[in-house]
Structure formats: structure tokens, C-alpha cells
Amino acid sequence: MVIASGAIDRRHLSPFTPTSDDSSSSFFSQDLVPTERQVGFWNSESMVDHKGSKSVFASPLEKIQPNGANHAGDPETPGGQAFKGLDILSLSNLMRQENASGSPSLSWGEILTNPISRLGLSTRETAFVEPTTADQHVPGYGKGLSSSSLSEVFSGKSREIVSGVLCQSTGTHTSIYDSDEPLESMEAIEAQTIGDLLPDDDDDLISGIADGFEFTGMSTNQDDADEDIFCTGGGMELENNDSVKGDKVQDGSFKSQISSGHSINKQPSRTLVVRNITANIEDSDLTVLFQQYGDIRMLYTSFKHHGFVTVSYYDIRAAQNAMRALHSKPLGLMKLDVQFSFPKENVPGKDIDKGMLVVSNIDSSISNDDLLQMLSVYGDVKEISSSPISCTKKFVEFYDVRAAEEALHDLNKGGISGPKFKVELSQHGEAGSCLRQQHSREWKQDSLPHQPKNSSPGTIGKLGTKCQDNSTVHNLFSPVNQQLESPTQCISTTGPQILSSPIRIKSTLQHNNQASVGDLSGPLGQGNFGRGIQTLHPRSLPEHHNRICNNSKSMTVSGRNASSRQDGVDHNIQKVGPAGFCGHSFDQNNEAFGFTEIGSCPLHGYHYTWNHTNVFPQSPSAPILWSNLQHPMHVHSYPGVPPHMLNTGSYPMDQHHLGSAPDNGGSFGNVHSFHPGSLGSIGLHGSPQLYPSELSAFASSRGNFREALFSPVGGGFQSLQQMCNAINGRNPMIHVSTSYDATNDRMRSRRHDGNPAQSENKRQFELDIDRIAKGEDSRTTLMIKNIPNKYNCKLLLAVIDENHRGTYDFIYLPIDFKNKCNVGYAFINMTDPQHIIPFYKTFNGKKWEKFNSEKVASLAYARIQGRSALIAHFQNSSLMNEDKWCRPMLFHKDGPNAGDQEPFPVGNNVRSRAGRNRSLISLDTKDASPSSSPDQESNSVGTANSTCRTTLEQT
């Protein structure tokens, strides 16, 4: 047996070096061996006949010397044989031979780590070569396959096998010669080889392989993941963890600087962390973007250069609506990632308690309905629950923290005649944990997809099997604590059970009776999952018309009279109903007590009765008990189904309310105090349910936030809600009385934001027909809200012209350029203030006839007033670069052409929309056609309408 072995000098060779011609000791002078980066098997083209082939399994970090690099006679190559690695195929044959001879089976790792003893070779048959200096400095790269460099040499009928095994401790190479054997079929050899190569230990399988790769983006500090407020995922990574960590050190702790100690949380809260924000976006644009969902309490943009900002709302519904509408929505080149931010445990004044009041010294004769009527004048009440400790104490939760503050100050001063109460802010721990559980469940269920069409708009989710039909709602659920064992019990599963959070709705819900709960004043929208609760007491959810709580045998909590002040308690809240219901009605919004700012009536039907709380059976008078929530049910809230957008107030930076159109930096925001009846029928006072799931964040401006100039703070809100409703085609809203009376007006006027200036600013956009009739209000520009999204300019003009042709000279229907639908509102300028009265009677509080829409139109004053001001505002707008059907329209207001369209004057400094991906297209630049020529602008309205329709069809 001839044995030759040699040590390899790997120091001076290029990745692929042909063997020298005078290398007589090399069997193949022109063979190349793969470089260190080629991991795995590498077969030459001559593999079929196994001549001149090399199969190499190389370590990622190991360099393999080309054959013939060392010449015969070289001190490092005794025997004149060039070093050759052990061929894998030959090794497999060798292993089978050894196994056939009765030797114990050998693993690949054993052969590599102890090749001589394992293979049964005697020391006299093996020549050892002292490692070279280069070899001595080669570190061990683990054990197993990846720590060896192997190759083979076939020559004629004989085969010389020289094995070089670089041991981790010695770096010694061993050469072994084995006699030739007939080769099996390639398939058999390959199968056997793979089996032999795989190590017994999984660690061996991957050891050494990952050593050759540098995972520079992977953080080695586990604390980074804990401190990263974006660890909840979603969106694009902003940067390397290392750089983020450095920024943290430089800018200070996120915990202390972001939202005053807020951190990412799956649970609904009033504060959101929005990531993937473009650093060059203006703060005013962000204000417009966020303000359309409600009054902004704080917009924190210090970390904008890191790609994220935090925004806090007064109303929790605004935060939830913003999250649903904006999460995963494109902003620039990235999609926004919106997450709830919740106060740290060590932060005083928990976010969840800010909207909750503790009302003490309540007479037993006062029901939840009575208390609801008393408190709803301050704002929308989300929940009324009984204290588990005292029957004379109740927790009252407002959607908006400002409503809670107003109620606190007013009630303690004797603001309500009759029984005297002691009112104080809830302290964290008293009801906070229960609220968080309820909010979490509510948000989770609210995130479910659309409710079935056959589901009642205001139906309440199915209750758990343990719910019992008690005489009063508060006893709706048995006090069994087992109910708490299943966080998802009593959660309606009417809608698809698609939850982002880990908690799923259990099958036990199937046993719940789905009796119709009646018409809740507001559509539950997508978020509405429940079908009904047969166990609810007939009087459980009274109707509140004109703020009068009428016990209804149906679960309808019809919204207060449309004219009732928007501040009113969410009718669903009224679910709190006569005795309140154990399944506390929770508006999607996390903070139970934040009332919706202006006219944002709690989401009717959205306040899901979350029956997870066990009601004290012993205290039937206690409608809603949080106390029995012994097991916090934290249902992680993820954005899912967009809820109706409750209009919440306007951002302090731009105090435009109800019907006011924000200026360039304004918001589309929430309309606050528009006429009480305007949205009453919608069930959301001042804020129709909005399903922003398909809402384009910048619908009215094609990405230019400032173009959304007209959406009143509250109006835009409503319009957005409307838009979403129409887009999603679901959740008809229960029509609520839209009568207007002075009583409701007075009730509405009692509510203010704590800031007299803000309250006055909101009221200034309300329509007062009496003042108009007396000539005391000469404003002429109106905002029409809650327009079905499928309406185009032709349909809208046709509806208006039925009775009001010639009474207006300007109209603008903002369009969402993404889906070619309107955004839910329009602006119209009447030629005379007196024309507003018949126009108001025709549209305000009335449903739209087309598309089976349940939306109810409402009117409010726009911020920009007058034809000339409107023209000045738009003539240099980027809208002038858009198709004409997307632009504002002017009409002749007198003369024989009264009512006919006239050209809209274009300014000399028309702005271009930044980031526009396509070339500007305007009918002015297109090939002239009868329907698109600029000359045709003076044609009749019918021609203009035809143009609108044609353009829509073409696009």
C-alpha cells in the first residue's frame, strides 16, 4: 500500500490557481479547487466517469490548495505525492467496507476527529506530516463536516486517497491509501454519502457553517430589543440596531422622552406611536394628517429624524380610529406602522383612568339610565359600572378626558340640580385594570372584520354561555368567575374571527344565543360583531331621544335625537342601559371615558357589551360591575377592522371645529359641535361612524396634506367616517330623530372643552336657522357631510339641482385619487344666506337615496367663506393640475346663464404636488374633445356632469 501525504501551504495561492505544468507528482495539472466561500459539494463536469473529478466539502472559512501546488521533492510533500483531500464518495465506500467487516458503524464526525483509530488503520500504514507554520496558525472552526477540507484522486484502476484532516487542536494532516473498489450507481453513492455526512448531533450539523458569515445587522444586546419601542413589529426597519442604540444614548431614554413614559402596547390608549415617518415631512402636515381623527392633545415630533412620532388624543376613539385608518397606509415610500403607546407602570395618572370618574353617594333610586342622562350633557359616556365595594358608588367612563374634567368640576360645584353627588377622578387600580381588560377585549373584537349583513347595525356581540337572563341588565351575567377564565368569552363572533392578537374567540361562544339586540342607534360597522343578546333584559338598552332615556324592549340604544348634543353619551353606552349591562358597552376606543369631542356621539353599536365582567348577582342594582374582573383579560389590541371615526376635537394648533375647513395646515379632523341633528341619525353625534380601512390618508389632496383645506375639524372627521362607511358598504346607521330644539341646543352649549376659546370656536361653525332667518348670520359657504362615497360630481349636482339649481355658485367635491371616490363631504357656496334655509331643510338629517346608503347628510359652515375667497384659495392649488372633475366648479349666479358652469380661473403660481409619481394630467393638456375641451366649461351643468362621468370612466 502506497501512502502519501503532504501539508498544504495556503498562504500564497489565489482562489483558483491552475497546477503548474511541471508538477509531475500531481495527477491532474489543470484542476481547480473551489475557494473558501464555496460551501458544499462541488463536482466537475467529468463526474460521470469519476476521472479527474473532485468532490469537495469545504469549510466556509477554509481555503483549499490547488492540486499540484506543491512539487515533488518539496520538503513538505514526502513521497512526491501532492496533497489530496479525502473524497467523500470514496470515504463512504470505505465506511461501508469497514462496517461490512464487522466493525462498529462510524459517523462522519468520528472519522474526522479520529481518522486512524476509527478506520482501523495501523500507524505503520499512515504517514504523518508535521504541520507547516500556516497550518499551525489556522484556528479550529468547529467540529464535523465544516472543519475539514476533502478532495479525492482517481487514477485508472487504482485509487490513492490522501486525507488531510485539520484537527482543531493539532492541525495535522493524515494521508490514507485505500484499495480500489467498484463504484456503485451514482444514486446509491449519493444517498449513502448524504446519510453518512449528516452528524448525529444537530449542533454538529451547523457548527462552523455560520462561523463564516457576519450578521452585522443582528444585535448582540438583548436589552436593545426590550428598549426598542418598535419591537412590536410592522413596517420597515429604520436602521441598524447598533445605530439606534447609539441614538438612544445620545438623545436619552425613549421611556423618559417619548410620550412621557409611554411604551408600545397592544392595548388601546389615547397615545399612538407612528413609525416609518419621513424625516422631511413638515410638522404641519403631520398635524393635518392626525387631526382629522380628533382633537390632538400633543404631537411629539422630536424623534421624527428617527422615523417616528407620537401623537396623543383627548378622545380614545380618535386614537383608535387613527390607528385603524393609518396603520399600513402608505406615506411617501413607506407604510406607516401605528401602535398604541401606554404609560409605564411607574407613571402617575394612568392614561386609562383619565376619562373615568368615581361618583359616590348615589341614591339607590337612581338608575344607570338616570345617571346617564345627567352626565351625558358633559360628553359621550362610554360606560357606567357599579363598584364592587359599594352600592352607592359607580364608575363613569367618558370617551374624552375633557368631558370627564368638565363633569368633575361642574358636579362638585352643584352644577346639576337634584341629588348631590361626590365626584372624584378614578385612581389607578380602582377600576383601571378592569378597564384595560375591557378595552383590550373591545379593541380586539372591534378589530374583527365586517359584521355579517344580516347583523343588526347596533347589535351587541354574543354573550358568553354563562350569561343569564336576569330581570336587570346588570345581572345579565352570572357572577361566576369562570367567565373570566376565558378572556374571549362573551365576545361576539358574528364577524370573522380574524384577530391580530394571540387571543382567539373560543368555540364556547357558539353556544351563546344570538337574539337580535335591536337597533342600536349607531351601526357597529365592521367592528360590530354581535348579533344580539337574548339574555339582555328588554329594558337593558334604552333609546335616548333628545337625551331622554326611553327604556326600549329592543336593545336599541338609538342615538339621542339627532339634534341632541353631540356630546351625548354613546348610545351604545346606554347599553349601560337602565341598569347598565354587565357586558359593559365599550366603544372601540380604549379609554372608556373619553367623550368624543364635538358632536362625536359615541359609536353607536360600537360600544360592545363586553360581558367578561362578572356582575355581582347579589347587587342587582349595580348595572355594570368591574370588580368581578378578577382575571385581567388583556386582549392585545391590533388594528383590524376600521371603526366609525368618532369626531373628537380639533388639534390645539388649529382650533377649527364642526364644519370648519382647516387651513393649509389644518386638519380634516373632527367636527365638533355642528348642528346636533346633523349626525344624530348616524348614531355618532357629530361624528358618523367612520371605517378608515379603505380611507386614503390624504384623500383630498393626493398626498398634499395641505390640499385638504376644507374638511372642518369635525366635518372632515365625519366625512371620513362616511367615506369609510360607504367604501366598506356596511353598517347601516339607524336613523335618529333629527328634530332641533332649544333644549338640546342648551344642553349642547353646556359642554365645553375646558377652554372657552375652543368651545366658542367649535360653536361658530354650527348652523342656526333662526339667526339666518333673522339675517344675523350672513355666511354662505357650507360643508355637506356624510356623502356616500360612490357619489360623483354628476350625481351630487343632479341631487342638488332638483330643487336648488341657481342658488349656488361654487361646489367642490374632494376626490380620493387612489380609488376615484369622493371622501365623504363637499363644499357649496350659496348665492344668498337665505338660500341656506330651504337647502338645510332638504338635506340636513336626511338619508341619501342612491346606493341604499344609510348615511344621513349634515350641514355646517365651512371655514373659508365667500366665492371670492374660495377662488383665491384654489386658483393656485395643485388641484389645478388635476383633471377637471377633481377641481372646484364655479357657476353663474345670475342672468340667463344662472346655474350654468363657468370656467374656474387658474392662478399664475399653481403649486405642483410633491412626490407625484405620474406626469400631471389635465384636461387642458389633453387632446381637445367635445367633452374635455376648456371651451366647454361654459356649457350647461349637464355637459359638465357628462364630463365628470366620462372622465371617471376613462380613469
From Swiss-Prot:
Please name every pair of cysteines joined by a disulfide bond in this record.
none
Where does the RRM domain start and stop, copy by copy? 270-343, 355-428
Key words of the record: Repeat, RNA-binding
Query: Transmembrane segments in this chain: where?
Result: none
Give one Pfam hit by family name.
Answer: RRM_2
Q: Does the keyword Repeat apply?
A: yes
Q: One MF term from GO for this chain?
A: RNA binding
Q: PROSITE patterns from the entry?
A: RRM
**Polar residues biased stretches:** 935-955
UniProt function note: Probable RNA-binding protein that may play a role in growth regulation.
Q: Known PANTHER family for this protein?
A: RNA RECOGNITION MOTIF-CONTAINING
Q: What is this protein called?
A: Protein MEI2-like 3
| Annotated organism of origin | Oryza sativa subsp. japonica
What are the top taxonomic ranks of the organism? Answer: Eukaryota, Viridiplantae, Streptophyta, Embryophyta, Tracheophyta
Recorded name of the encoding gene: ML3
